[in-house]
Design a protein with these regions (language model features):
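An acidic/histidine-cluster motif and surrounding catalytic segment
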Residues: 1-57, 62-167
Length: 167
């Protein structure tokens, strides 16, 4: 699922993926056609989450701490019944955390595509078509304060068909 003219590189990555060891089991799905970023991620996450009820998603170029998967799995278990928590993330924007903050986690209004996990019931709430866009625009200042101006611009571009991001 790469760019036109990169068939050899795509095959190299597929062979590498097939060689990965260290997990109880590995399932991979290779696409015959380039679906684009948004459709690939949304479709892949939906496939896994529909089968298992939850999912952990990683970017392909991350370097993880040894306890990363344990952290996300604990978060999935701990917050599973808290409908206010949409996802558990292993990365966030830079925030000021007090030096004496005693916990391993904190709440934040933004999500991150760089290592995260969620549950099927939360995933099913996402409005991929941005049907509520008029409400977002009407409450623009509050949205930007909560999510950031970059997210507002990205969603606006998605709504206008200029961007096909999923995050």
């Amino acid at each position: 699922d790469g760019k036109v003219g990169e068939k050899e590189k795509v095959e190299e990555v597929r062979e590498y993926v097939k060689s990965i060891k260290g997990f109880k089991s590995i399932h991979y799905t290779f696409s015959k056609n380039n679906k684009g970023l948004a459709d690939s991620i949304i479709g892949g996450v939906s496939q896994v989450i529909n089968q298992y009820g939850k999912v952990i998603v990683l970017e392909d170029d991350l370097v993880l701490m040894p306890n990363f998967l344990n952290f996300l799995n604990q978060g999935l278990d701990y917050y599973e019944n808290n409908q206010k928590v949409m996802s558990v993330c292993g990365h966030s924007c830079k925030v000021k955390v007090p030096a004496d903050y005693p916990y391993d986690a904190y709440f934040f209004t933004r999500s991150s595509s760089w290592g995260w996990a969620t549950w099927k019931d939360r995933w099913d709430l996402v409005d991929w078509k941005l049907n509520d866009w008029d409400s977002v625009v009407a409450n623009r200042k509050a949205f930007i304060k909560s999510q950031g101006s970059d997210v507002f611009k990205m969603l606006r571009d998605c709504k206008l068909g200029k961007n096909h991001s999923w995050a």
